[in-house]
Amino acid sequence: MNRSDILIPGDHNVENYLAAIAAVWGEVAPATIAEYARTFGGVPHRSELLRVRRGVKWYNDSIGSSPSRTIAGLKSFDRRVILIAGGYDKHIPYDPLGPVAADTVKTAILMGATGDKIEQAIRACSDLPIVRVKNMEEAVAAANRLAQDGDIVFMSPASASFDMYRNFEERGNHFRRLVMEMEE
């Protein structure tokens, strides 16, 4: 099995697979282990691969409710992503997100009460394209317009959900529904 066989991104997931393999070695056939790695899309709302549509991978990381969680998610990809971020303002600093976004984000689609703070953090380090939207529907539509074959769309808000949703699960489920309803 190669690293590229693991469907979910990130060094931490490679480490998780190595630990799991060690735990079941001799009890589970290597072919079964490899098949699981190739097909497991992740835990809901945690860098969860929702679908590949027209060559674009759509990931739901609604659990990314702080800059540090979004930073960890951004660092797990091997290419720049289209980032959907923003939400309720917990009055935390967004400055650490700027340099990471400068290195890992192709376009940022921002919404919610923290949209301005996230934009300021990014602008302090980069002039990457930023699109402002009012809600998740507009964010998904904008990402769909911008995304090209080979791109990754990563919804990781770096913010709480309470300005638009009851919780991160509701936000993630809404994103999932919008992504899954897009025509092939």
Name each region found by the language model.
Residues 2-105:
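Nucleotide phosphate-binding/pyrophosphate-handling subdomain across enzymes
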Residues 26, 129-132, 164:
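A structural signal for short, well-ordered beta-strand elements
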Residues 56-57, 161-165:
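A short acidic, helix-capping loop that chelates divalent metal ions and anchors anionic groups
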Residues 69, 117-121, 164:
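Phosphate- and divalent-cation-binding pockets in alpha/beta enzyme and binding domains
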Residues 95-151:
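C-terminal helical cap/extension that packs against the catalytic core
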Residues 145, 163, 176-184:
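Phosphate-binding loop of NTP-binding sites
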Residues 154-158:
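Short beta-strands and strand-loop turn motifs
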